[in-house]
C-alpha cells in the first residue's frame, strides 16, 4: 500500500519516547477528565505513569503483535477515590462480547455525536503523520441504457403467451425473428461525477431510472440490457479492476437468512468482506507514529486495531455498525421471514444497509435505504454516514424516497433524475436557484426534496408556478435537461468532465484488483461456521427426517417380518429383493427434502455471491461435508431397525456392506437434489426437474425393466443411472450369502438359487460388482457436487420481467380530458405556490378538497362510527433469547395501558420510533392478532367490539402489500368490491365504483397491469401500496386502518396516497394511519396525533393544530426541551425531542408526563363519553357474517382463481411438460410390452411401468401445487381477516380450478402411454384407464394442497408430504403383493390410495385376459386372469368398488384441505 514511507519522521529528533508518552497520556487524560472528574489528580498521575509504562511495553513488541495489542480503558470503582479510569492491555483479536459492549457503551453513548467525535479523532491521528487516505471518484459519460420488452396484453404471463414466447425464442436462435418488442430507454445520454468526501443524494420519481443508474455505477447491470457510454473509477474502466469489490450496491430488497440473528448476519458479512486496506493503513500509521514518538489515544487505537483485525468471528466493527444504525436493541433477535416472526421491516432495512457498511468498502451506492424507517432514525443513520463520508473521504450516492428537510440538508450534492434524464446534478445550494430560473418556487412549508420530485411531473408542476409575468405552460423533462447544460452548475460539470481523470493522482489502494479480499481458507471457515449454525437452527428439519426414516423403517421391518419370510425358492427371494428395492428407493427419496431447503436458500446465496462475499465452492463444500453426519445417523437408523428384523443375510460383514451402500445412496441423492435445485432455481421448476430426474434413474435402474429388456435406444441410460449400481450392489451383497448359494433353484436344477435369482433380475454374477457399485456411487456423489458448485458459480436467479405499461401512458390525452384526475393532481390550480396537503387542515378540509368532484367514487352510503379504547395491554410469551439472557418473567408486555379514541371525519396519525408498538396497537384494535394476550376495553360507537361484525365495517391496509400475484390491478379491485359491498349494490354500480376508486388513487393507467410478486415482477413498491389502499377503499368501510401507507413511496406518490386518504376522511369516515417519516405537508394533513414511545406507551394524544402548533406547544412546555428551529419538520423535531436520548438528558419519562397532563384527562373524558352509546343507537347487526352468500363467495373466488391458474405457466405449463416427458419416457422405455404375455415377468414389467408413471406424475402434481397454494394462502389470510369470504368457498374454488387442468393432463397422458405401451384398444378398457388415471392425478394434487393446509410453510409441507410417499410406495402392491402382506398390516393396504390405483389399472387391462402365461419357480402355467388374482389378489369384478374408492380419496383430500384452511391459522401476528 502506497503511504509514502519515505516521508521524514515527524517531531524533533531528540525527543525521548518516555517524554512523548507522558505528553500524550496527559493529553488523553484531559479529554476524559470531564467524565471521570471525581478521581484525585494524585491518583490520576500514578495511573498516567502506569499507562505510560504499558505503552512503552507495547512499543517493544514485534510488529505483528503490536498491531493487535492495545490498552482498553475501563471504569474501576474505588471506595477512597471514587470511580477511576484504568487501562488494561488487551489483544483485539480476543475481545469477548462483554469487552466489546463495554467499549461501545463508553465511547458511543449518543450515536451521531460520539460517532463524529471518534471519527474526528481517527482522522486527526491519520493527518498528524501525513498519510493520505485512498479516495474514489466515479464518472459516467454519455451513459445510455435500453431494454427490449413486451407491451400490453402480450406482457401478461398467460399459458398462451408463454408458449408463444418460447416458440419465438427458439426461432430467434436460428435467425427467424417474429417477436415484436418495444424498446424502452431507461437512461438517456447522461453524464456526471460522484466525488469523494461529498454526500450525494439521488432523487427522482418512480421508474425514472434511479435503481438502474445505481446498478450501472456498481457494475451490476443485467447482461440483457443494451449499454453504451463509459463508467470509470479514478480513470479506470470497469473491466480494469473489480468494481463489485471496490464499491457496494445496497439493494432496496431485503434478502437475509431468516433464522440468523441480526448480529450473526453482520458478523458473517464482516468476516467475508475482510478488512481491506485497514491493516496496511494501521501498519504504516504505527510505523510513522513510532518514528515520530507519537502516542495514540487508547480508544482510537483500540477502535482502529480492532477494525483492522483479520479473521475474527465477532468483530468490533459489527458492534459499532449495530450502534450507529440503532440495531443494538435487536442484535440477538432473528431476522425472520414471511412465516417466522423476527425484526420489524424498518429494522430489516437497516440490516441490509449494515451488511454492507460493516465491510471496508468506501464507495457505496445505496438504494432507498430509509423505507420503513421513521424520520428521526433516518436522520440519525444518514448523519452517521455523512460523518463517515466527510471524515473518511468515502464516496456515497444514496437514493431516498421521502427525505425530511433536515435529512436533505445533510447532503452536499443532488442528482435529480426524471424520465431517464438528468435534470440537475451539482451542489444542493444551487438547485432551487435552477428551478426559480424557470419560474418555479418551493413553498415555505414544503420540503425541498418533495418539491424536486413533483416539479418535473406534468400532473404536479403547475402548483409551483410563481411567475406573474407570463402564463403557465408545461415544461417537459427534456427542456429542463437541456437548460441545465447551460446553467452555471451544468457548465462547470461539463468542463470538469472534459478533463480526463489523472490516474497518477489516484491512490493505488483505492481500487480493488483481487476478486476476494480474504484468504480462501478464511472464507471456507466462515461459510463452515455459518452452515453449522444453520444446521443447529434447522434441527427440527433433521430430527423430522430421522424420525420419518425410523417410522418407515419400523413399518418396513414389520411388513417384511423375518418370521414371515423364507429362503426356499425364487418367489421368497423376490420378497427380499422387494425389501432391498424399497430401502434403496426410500433412502433415495429421503434426499428430496434437501431440494426445498436449497431452493429457499438460493436468493440470499445469489446476493452474497454477486457481492463477492465468497466463491461458490466455499458454500457447497460445507453443505456437503456437514450433511455427512446426518446421513450416517439416518443410515444407521434404517439399518438397525430393518436389517435383522427383515432377516437379511446374518453375516456382520454383509450388514456393514449394506450400510455403506445405503449411506452412499443417501449422499448421492442429497447431492443430486441440491444440483437440481441449483439448476432449476425455483420451487415449482425444481419439483418438476427433481421428479423427472428421479423418474429417469428409476426407470432405467434395471429393476422395473431388466437390462436385457431395455430398448436399444435407452441402453446407454442404464449405465448412467446411479440406481443401476445401487441395485446391483445391494442384490449381489445379499444373494451371494451362503444361504442362497448353498441351495439349488429346484430339485431337478443344477443352478444355485442365488444365481437363478440374479439371472432373473439380469444382475451381474461377479462378487466384485459390490465394490464397483460402491466406487460408482462415490463417483456420482463427487460428480453431482462438482456440477452443483459449477451451477452455483455460473447460473443466475430466474428473474421475471414486468410488462411495459407506462404510468404516464397517454398523458396528453389525460390533460384537460379528465377533470377529476386533474383536480386530484393539482388539488385546486387556483392556489398556485401553496402546498395543497398543508391546506387540508381541520378548518378548510372541505374547501381544499376541491368540492364534491374529489369525493366522486366515495358516495356509497355508510354509517359513521367512532372507536374508543381504554387501558389496552398486550403481552406475548417471553422470547427464548431473552430467557436465555436471564429474564425471569414469563410474558413480555408490548402495549402498556393505551387509551384513546378515533372519530369520524378525523384523520389520526399513529407515530413513534421503530419498535414503539404502532403496528401492534393497530393489529390489536383491528382484531388481526393471532397470538398473545390482550387486555382492555375496545368499543365501537359505545358498544363492545365484536370482531365478526367489525370486519364488515372496517378496512385494514397492511404494511406488507399482500395480493394475488397473477391477477391485474382492476381484477383485484373487482374481487374486493364484489365480495365486500352489500348485495343491494348492483353489478354496474360496483363496476363504476371500482373505476372511480382506481382514479382516486391514480391507478387507472395501470388497470391491466399484472400485480406480480414483490421485487420480482409486476407493480413497483409505490404502485403496490396504492393498490393495497384501493382494495380497502372499494369495500366502502366506516373505519380504515392504514399501516404505513406512505412507506416505500416517493414524495409525489405519498402525496397522491394522502390525497386519497384525505378525501376518504372528508366523507365522514374514521381513518387511522401509522406513519414513519412524513414530510411537513403530509404530517400536517392529519387532524390528530397519537405518539408512542418504545415500550408501547403513549406520550401524546391530541390535535395537531394549524401548522402543528398544538403538539409543538405541548412539548416546548416542558423545561429543557429546545425550541423547534425555523422551517424544521415538526414530525422530526417531535420524535427527536421525545427520544430516549432526550429523556436521559432531561431525566424525564414523557409517558409519565403525559399521564399527569390535562391533555390525558381530557382524552380520558372523551373515551368515557364515546364508551356510552348515543341515545336511540343500536349495536352493529348484520343478518349474515359476510356480504355475499356462499354461492356468491364461491363464484367470486372461482373467478379470481381461474385467472390465477391461467396466468401461472410456471405451474401449469411446467406440470404439462413434465407429464408429456413422463408419458414419452414410459412409452419409449416400455415400448409395446403391454401385448407381451408369455410369462409372469412381462406382467411384472407392465405393473412396474404403470406404478412408476402414476407415482411420478402424482408426486409431481403434489409438489408443484404446494408453492401455488402457499402463495395464495398468504393472500387468503388477509382476505379472510378482512371479512371477504369464509374459508369453504375459497377452498372449494381452488379445488374446482384443478379439475379442467388435470383432465387435459390425463387425456394426453393416457393417449400417449396407452398407445406406446401397447395396451388393447377397447373402448371400455381405455375409458377405465383414463378414469383411474384422472382420479389418481386428482387425489395426488389434492393431497399436495392438503399438506400445505396442515403445515405452516411450503418447506414443512414438502417434508410432510414426502413422509407418506414412502408408505404409499410400500403398500402400493408392487414391492410386496397383497397376499404376502402380514395380516396386521393388511388394513393399511386398503387405505393406501396408490394401491387402489394399481389395482384399477391392472384389473381394467388384464382382468378378462385368458391367455396362459409361464409362472416363476416351476409352478404350473396359469391364465393372466388367474395369475393376477392368485399372485396380486386383484379380482376382475371389483372395478366398481375401485372407482368408488378413488372418487372417495379425491373428495377426502379435498375436504381435509378445506377443513384445515378453515380451522388452522399459521400466520403469527
Swiss-Prot record:
Residues annotated to bind ATP 2: 912-919
One GO term of the biological process aspect: defense response to oomycetes
A Pfam family the protein falls into: PDR_assoc
Membership in a protein family: Belongs to the ABC transporter superfamily. ABCG family. PDR (TC 3.A.1.205) subfamily.
SMART domains named in the record: AAA (SM00382)
Induction: Induced by cycloheximide (CHX), cold/dark treatment, cadmium, lead, sclareol and sclareolide. Repressed by abscisic acid (ABA). Induced by infection of avirulent and virulent bacterial pathogens (Pseudomonas syringae pv. tomato with or without avrRpt2, avrRpm1 or avrRps4, respectively) and fungal pathogens (e.g. Colletotrichum gloeosporioides).
Disruption phenotype: Defects in efflux of the auxin precursor indole-3-butyric acid (IBA) associated with developmental defects such as abnormally long root hairs, increased lateral root production and larger cotyledon expansion. Reduced thymidine and coumarin (e.g. scopolin) exudation in the rhizosphere. Overaccumulation in leaves of 4-O-beta-D-glucosyl-indol-3-yl formamide (4OGlcI3F) upon Blumeria graminis conidiospore inoculation, a pathogen-inducible tryptophan-derived compound, which biosynthesis is dependent on the PEN2 metabolic pathway. Reduced shoot fresh weight.
Example of a GO cellular component annotation carried by this entry: endoplasmic reticulum
Role this protein plays: Together with ABCG37, regulates auxin homeostasis and responses by playing a dual role in coumarin (e.g. esculin) and in the auxin precursor indole 3-butyric acid (IBA) efflux transport, thus influencing cotyledons, roots and root hairs development. Mediates the transport (export into the apoplast) of distinct indole-type metabolites in distinct biological processes; a precursor of 4-O-beta-D-glucosyl-indol-3-yl formamide (4OGlcI3F), a pathogen-inducible tryptophan-derived compound (e.g.
Site (Required for both preinvasive defense to nonadapted powdery mildews and salicylic acid (SA)-, microbe-associated molecular patterns (MAMPs)- dependent defense against host-adapted pathogens, and defense responses toward necrotrophic pathogens. Necessary to prevent the sensitivity to IBA (an auxin precursor)) location in chain: 354, 915
Positions of region (Disordered): 806-852
Keywords: Acetylation, ATP-binding, Auxin signaling pathway, Cell membrane, Detoxification, Endoplasmic reticulum, Golgi apparatus, Hypersensitive response, Membrane, Nucleotide-binding, Phosphoprotein, Plant defense, Repeat, Stress response, Transmembrane, Transmembrane helix, Transport
This protein's name: ABC transporter G family member 36
Superkingdom as given in the UniProt entry: Eukaryota
Name of the gene this protein is made from: ABCG36
Amino acid at each position: 500500500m502506497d503511504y509514502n514511507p519515505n516521508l521524514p519522521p515527524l517531531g524533533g529528533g531528540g525527543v525521548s519516547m518516555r517524554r512523548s508518552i507522558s505528553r500524550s497520556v496527559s493529553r488523553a487524560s484531559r479529554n476524559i477528565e470531564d467524565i471521570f472528574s471525581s478521581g484525585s489528580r494524585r491518583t490520576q498521575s500514578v495511573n498516567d505513569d502506569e499507562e505510560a509504562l504499558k505503552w512503552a511495553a507495547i512499543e517493544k513488541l514485534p510488529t505483528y503483535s503490536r498491531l493487535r495489542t492495545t490498552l482498553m480503558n475501563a471504569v474501576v470503582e474505588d471506595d477512597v477515590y471514587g470511580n477511576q479510569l484504568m487501562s488494561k492491555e488487551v489483544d483485539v483479536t480476543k475481545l469477548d462480547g462483554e469487552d466489546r459492549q463495554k467499549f461501545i457503551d463508553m465511547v458511543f453513548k449518543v450515536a451521531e455525536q460520539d460517532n463524529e467525535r471518534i471519527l474526528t479523532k481517527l482522522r486527526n491521528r491519520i493527518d498528524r503523520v501525513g498519510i493520505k487516505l485512498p479516495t474514489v471518484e466515479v464518472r459516467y459519460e454519455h451513459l445510455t441504457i435500453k431494454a427490449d420488452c413486451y407491451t400490453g396484453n402480450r406482457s401478461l404471463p398467460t399459458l398462451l403467451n408463454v408458449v408463444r414466447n418460447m416458440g419465438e425464442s427458439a426461432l430467434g436462435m436460428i435467425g427467424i425473428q417474429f417477436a415484436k418488442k418495444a424498446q424502452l430507454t431507461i437512461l438517456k445520454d447522461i453524464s456526471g461525477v460522484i466525488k469523494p468526501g461529498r454526500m450525494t443524494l439521488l432523487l427522482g420519481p418512480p421508474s425514472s431510472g434511479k435503481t438502474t443508474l445505481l446498478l450501472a455505477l456498481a457494475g451490476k447491470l443485467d447482461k440483457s440490457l443494451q449499454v453504451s457510454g463509459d463508467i470509470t473509477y479514478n480513470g479506470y474502466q470497469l473491466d480494469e479492476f473489480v468494481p463489485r469489490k471496490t464499491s457496494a450496491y445496497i439493494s432496496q430488497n431485503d434478502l437475509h437468512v431468516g433464522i440468523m440473528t441480526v448480529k450473526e448476519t453482520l458478523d458473517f458479512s464482516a468476516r467475508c468482506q475482510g478488512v481491506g486496506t485497514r491493516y496496511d493503513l494501521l501498519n504504516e500509521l504505527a510505523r510513522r507514529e513510532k518514528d515520530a514518538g507519537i502516542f495514540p489515544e487508547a480508544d482510537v487505537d483500540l477502535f482502529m486495531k480492532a477494525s483492522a483485525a483479520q479473521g475474527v468471528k465477532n468483530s468490533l466493527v459489527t458492534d459499532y455498525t449495530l450502534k450507529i444504525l440503532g440495531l443494538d436493541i435487536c442484535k440477538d433477535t432473528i431476522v425472520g421471514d414471511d412465516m417466522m416472526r423476527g425484526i420489524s421491516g424498518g429494522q430489516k432495512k437497516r440490516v441490509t444497509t449494515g451488511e454492507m457498511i460493516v465491510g471496508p468498502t468506501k464507495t457505496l451506492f445505496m438504494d432507498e435505504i430509509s423505507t420503513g424507517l421513521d424520520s428521526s432514525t433516518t436522520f440519525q443513520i444518514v448523519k452517521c454516514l455523512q460523518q463517515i463520508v466527510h471524515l473518511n473521504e468515502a464516496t456515497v450516492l444514496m437514493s431516498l424516497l421521502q427525505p425530511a428537510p433536515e435529512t436533505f440538508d445533510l447532503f452536499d450534492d443532488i442528482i435529480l433524475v426524471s424520465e431517464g434524464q438528468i435534470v440537475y446534478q451539482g451542489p444542493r445550494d444551487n438547485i432551487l436557484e435552477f428551478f426559480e430560473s424557470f419560474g418555479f418556487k418551493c413553498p415555505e412549508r414544503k420540503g425541498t426534496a418533495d418539491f424536486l420530485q413533483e416539479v418535473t411531473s406534468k400532473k404536479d408542476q403547475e402548483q409551483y408556478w410563481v411567475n406573474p409575468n407570463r402564463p403557465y405552460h408545461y415544461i417537459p423533462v427534456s427542456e429542463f435537461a437541456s437548460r441545465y447544460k447551460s446553467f452555471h452548475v451544468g457548465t462547470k460539470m461539463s468542463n470538469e468532465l472534459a478533463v480526463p481523470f489523472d490516474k497518477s493522482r489516484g491512490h493505488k489502494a483505492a481500487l480493488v484488483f483481487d476478486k476476494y479480499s480474504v484468504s480462501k481458507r478464511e472464507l471456507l471457515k466462515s461459510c463452515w461456521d455459518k452452515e453449522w449454525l444453520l444446521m443447529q437452527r434447522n434441527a427440527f428439519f433433521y430430527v423430522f427426517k430421522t424420525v420419518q426414516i425410523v417410522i418407515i423403517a419400523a413399518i418396513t421391518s414389520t411388513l417384511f417380518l423375518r418370521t414371515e419370510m423364507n429362503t426356499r425358492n425364487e418367489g421368497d427371494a423376490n420378497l427380499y429383493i422387494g425389501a432391498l428395492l424399497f430401502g434403496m428407493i426410500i433412502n433415495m427419496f429421503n434426499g428430496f427434502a434437501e431440494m426445498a431447503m436449497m431452493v429457499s436458500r438460493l436468493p440470499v446465496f445469489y446476493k452474497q455471491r454477486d457481492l463477492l462475499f465468497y466463491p461458490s465452492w466455499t458454500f457447497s463444500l460445507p453443505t456437503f461435508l456437514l450433511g455427512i453426519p446426518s446421513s450416517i445417523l439416518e443410515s444407521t437408523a434404517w439399518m438397525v431397525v430393518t436389517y435383522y428384523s427383515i432377516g437379511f443375510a446374518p453375516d456382520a460383514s454383509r450388514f456393514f456392506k449394506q450400510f455403506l451402500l445405503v449411506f452412499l445412496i443417501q449422499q448421492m441423492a442429497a447431492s443430486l437434489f441440491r444440483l437440481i435445485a441449483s439448476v432449476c432455481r425455483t420451487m415449482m421448476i425444481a419439483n418438476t426437474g427433481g421428479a423427472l430426474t428421479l423418474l429417469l434413474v428409476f426407470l432405467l435402474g434395471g429393476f422395473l425393466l431388466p437390462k436385457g429388456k431395455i430398448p436399444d435406444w435407452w441402453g446407454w441410460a442404464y449405465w448412467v443411472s446411479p440406481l443401476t449400481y445401487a441395485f446391483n450392489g445391494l442384490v449381489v451383497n445379499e444373494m451371494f450369502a451362503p444361504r442362497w448359494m448353498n441351495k439349488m433353484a429346484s430339485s431337478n436344477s443344477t443352478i444355485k438359487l442365488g444365481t437363478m435369482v440374479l439371472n432373473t433380475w439380469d444382475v451381474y454374477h461377479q462378487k466384485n460388482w459390490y465394490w464397483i457399485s460402491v466406487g460408482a456411487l462415490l463417483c456420482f456423489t463427487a460428480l453431482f457436487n462438482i456440477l452443483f458448485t459449477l451451477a452455483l458459480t455460473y447460473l443466475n436467479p430466474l428473474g421475471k420481467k414486468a410488462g411495459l405499461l407506462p404510468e404516464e401512458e397517454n398523458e396528453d390525452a389525460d390533460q384537460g380530458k379528465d377533470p377529476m384526475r386533474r383536480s386530484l393532481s393539482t388539488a385546486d390550480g387556483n392556489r398556485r405556490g401553496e402546498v395543497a396537503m398543508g391546506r387540508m387542515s381541520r378548518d378548510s378540509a372541505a374547501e381544499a378538497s376541491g368540492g364534491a368532484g374529489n369525493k366522486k367514487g366515495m358516495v356509497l352510503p355508510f354509517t359513521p362510527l367512532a372507536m374508543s379504547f381504554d387501558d389496552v395491554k398486550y403481552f406475548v410469551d417471553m422470547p427464548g433469547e431473552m430467557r436465555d439472557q436471564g429474564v425471569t418473567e414469563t410474558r413480555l408486555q408490548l402495549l402498556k395501558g393505551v387509551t384513546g379514541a378515533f372519530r369520524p371525519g378525523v384523520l389520526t396519525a399513529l407515530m413513534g420510533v421503530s419498535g414503539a408498538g404502532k403496528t401492534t396497537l393497530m393489529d390489536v384494535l383491528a382484531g388481526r392478532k393471532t397470538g398473545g394476550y390482550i387486555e382492555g376495553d375496545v368499543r365501537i360507537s359505545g358498544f363492545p367490539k365484536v370482531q365478526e361484525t367489525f370486519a364488515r365495517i372496517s378496512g385494514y391496509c397492511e404494511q406488507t402489500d399482500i395480493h394475488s400475484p397473477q391477477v391485474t390491478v382492476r381484477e383485484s379491485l373487482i374481487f374486493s368490491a364484489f365480495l365486500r359491498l352489500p348485495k343491494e349494490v348492483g353489478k354496474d354500480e360496483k363496476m363504476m365504483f371500482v373505476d372511480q376508486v382506481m382514479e382516486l388513487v391514480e391507478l387507472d393507467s395501470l388497470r391491466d397491469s399484472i400485480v406480480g410478486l414483490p421485487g420480482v415482477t409486476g407493480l413497483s413498491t409505490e404502485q403496490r401500496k396504492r393498490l393495497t389502499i384501493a382494495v380497502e377503499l372499494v369495500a366502502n368501510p366506516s373505519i380504515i386502518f392504514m399501516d404505513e401507507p406512505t412507506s416505500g413511496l416517493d414524495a409525489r406518490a405519498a402525496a397522491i396516497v394522502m390525497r386519497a386518504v384525505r378525501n376518504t376522511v372528508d366523507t365522514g369516515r374514521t381513518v387511522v394511519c401509522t406513519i414513519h417519516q412524513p414530510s411537513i405537508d403530509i404530517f400536517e394533513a392529519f387532524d390528530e396525533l397519537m405518539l408512542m414511545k418504545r415500550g408501547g406507551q403513549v406520550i401524546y394524544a391530541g390535535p395537531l393544530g394549524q401548522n402543528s402548533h398544538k403538539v409543538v406547544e405541548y412539548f416546548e412546555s416542558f423545561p429543557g426541551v429546545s425550541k423547534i428551529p425555523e422551517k424544521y419538520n415538526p414530525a422530526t423535531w417531535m420524535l427527536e425531542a421525545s427520544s430516549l436520548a432526550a429523556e436521559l438528558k432531561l431525566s424525564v419519562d414523557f409517558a409519565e408526563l403525559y399521564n399527569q397532563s390535562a391533555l390525558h384527562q381530557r382524552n380520558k373524558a372523551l373515551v368515557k363519553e364515546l364508551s356510552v352509546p348515543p341515545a336511540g343507537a343500536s349495536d352493529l347487526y348484520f343478518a349474515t357474517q359476510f356480504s355475499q352468500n356462499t354461492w356468491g363467495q364461491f363464484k367470486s373466488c372461482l373467478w379470481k382463481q381461474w385467472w390465477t391458474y391461467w396466468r401461472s405457466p410456471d405451474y401449469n405449463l411446467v406440470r404439462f411438460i413434465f407429464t408429456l416427458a413422463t408419458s414419452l419416457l414410459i412409452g419409449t422405455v416400455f415400448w409395446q410390452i403391454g401385448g407381451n404375455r408369455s410369462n409372469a415377468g412381462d406382467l411384472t414389467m407392465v405393473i412396474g411401468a404403470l406404478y412408476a408413471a402414476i407415482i411420478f406424475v402424482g408426486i409431481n402434481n403434489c409438489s408443484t401445487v404446494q408453492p401455488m397454494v402457499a402463495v395464495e394462502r398468504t393472500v387468503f389470510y388477509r382476505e379472510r381477516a378482512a371479512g371477504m369470504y369464509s374459508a369453504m368457498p375459497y377452498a372449494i374454488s381452488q379445488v374446482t380450478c384443478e379439475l379442467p387442468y388435470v383432465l387435459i393432463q390425463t387425456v394426453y397422458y393416457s393417449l400417449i402411454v396407452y398407445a406406446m405401451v401397447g395396451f388393447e384398444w377397447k373402448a371400455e378398457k381405455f375409458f377405465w384407464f383414463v378414469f383411474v388415471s384422472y382420479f389418481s392425478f386428482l387425489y395426488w394434487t389434492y393431497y399436495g394442497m392438503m399438506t400445505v393446509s396442515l403445515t405452516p410453510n411450503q418447506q414443512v409441507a414438502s417434508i410432510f408430504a414426502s413422509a407418506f410417499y414412502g408408505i404409499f410406495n410400500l403398500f402400493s402392491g408392487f414391492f410386496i403383493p397383497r397376499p404376502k402382506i402380514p395380516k396386521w398390516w393388511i388394513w393399511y393396504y386398503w387405505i393406501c390410495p396408490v394401491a387402489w390405483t394399481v389395482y384399477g389399472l391392472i384389473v381394467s387391462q388384464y382382468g378378462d385376459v385368458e391367455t396362459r402365461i409361464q409362472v416363476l419357480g416351476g409352478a404350473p402355467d396359469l391364465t393372466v386372469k388367474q395369475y393376477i388374482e392368485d399372485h396380486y389378489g386383484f379380482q376382475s369384478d371389483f372395478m366398481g368398488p375401485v372407482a368408488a374408492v378413488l372418487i372417495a380419496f379425491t373428495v377426502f383430500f379435498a375436504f381435509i384441505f378445506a377443513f384445515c384452511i378453515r380451522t388452522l391459522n399459521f400466520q403469527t401476528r
